[in-house]
């Protein structure tokens, strides 16, 4: 049962989306501390959705259909806003000595964790994933120890996956490539965020209306 959970969740994580683009961009352009904080935020978001799924997220959406639409509308709006800011970026990243220290001084751990959390919570793809695919996996988990273990598996696997992604994109070759093409990478990532956001807003409005 837990093996099925690990496999299903791994494939869910491997599907490219806002979380992946956020972590890879942070790893290539920001400090290690800030990137890990972002990963912690995303992991907290996954933990939140995982807990809701175990408490009957799918049943809640069936009982209150408009709730799903509201979540998609709010999440889509935030993603679209992030996408707009990134899509209009005209600056190239510059990596200098002590850049990690400078990055760390420009923000706080709390702010970076919150950024990662908001990126995940605003991603309605995660909502659909946990309310449909993951619910089918978790439906047979009824014992308290199984619930605790399943929750731990989801949280640990999420953090480990994105930490590995951050290690890959924080390598010097990745930083050089990002520095050289950062404007275009940010613009493309922004377009992806904007697309996700607009689709979610559109679908959210449709669900609320109907």
UniProtKB/Swiss-Prot annotation:
Gene Ontology biological process terms from the UniProt entry: amino acid transport
UniProt keyword annotations, A-Z: Cell membrane, Membrane, Transmembrane, Transmembrane helix
Subcellular location: Cell membrane
Keyword check for Membrane: yes
InterPro entries on file: Homoserine/Threonine_efflux, LeuE-type
Its membrane topology: Multi-pass membrane protein
UniProt cross-references to Pfam families, sorted A to Z: LysE (PF01810)
GO cellular component: a single term: plasma membrane
Name of the protein this chain belongs to: Uncharacterized membrane protein HI_1307
Family recorded in the similarity comment: Belongs to the Rht family.
GO MF annotations, alphabetized: amino acid transmembrane transporter activity
């Amino acid at each position: 049962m837990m093996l099925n959970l690990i496999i299903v969740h791994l494939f869910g994580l491997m599907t490219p989306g806002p979380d992946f683009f956020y972590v890879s961009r942070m790893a290539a352009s920001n400090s290690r501390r800030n990137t890990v904080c972002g990963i912690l935020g995303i992991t907290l978001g996954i933990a939140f959705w995982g807990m809701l799924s175990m408490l009957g997220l799918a049943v809640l959406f069936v009982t209150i259909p408009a709730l799903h639409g509201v979540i998609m509308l709010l999440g889509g709006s935030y993603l679209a806003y992030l996408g707009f800011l990134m899509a209009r970026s005209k600056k190239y990243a510059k990596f200098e000595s002590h850049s990690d220290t400078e990055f760390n001084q420009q923000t706080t751990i709390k702010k970076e964790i919150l950024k990662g959390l908001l990126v995940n919570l605003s991603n309605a793809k995660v909502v659909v994933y946990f309310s449909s695919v993951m619910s089918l996996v978790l439906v047979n988990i009824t014992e308290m120890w199984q619930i605790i273990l399943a929750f731990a598996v989801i949280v640990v696997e999420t953090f480990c996956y994105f930490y590995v992604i951050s290690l890959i994109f924080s390598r010097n070759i990745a930083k050089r490539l990002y520095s050289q093409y950062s404007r275009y990478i940010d613009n493309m990532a922004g377009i992806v965020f904007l697309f996700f956001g607009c689709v979610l807003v559109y679908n959210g409005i449709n669900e609320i209306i109907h």
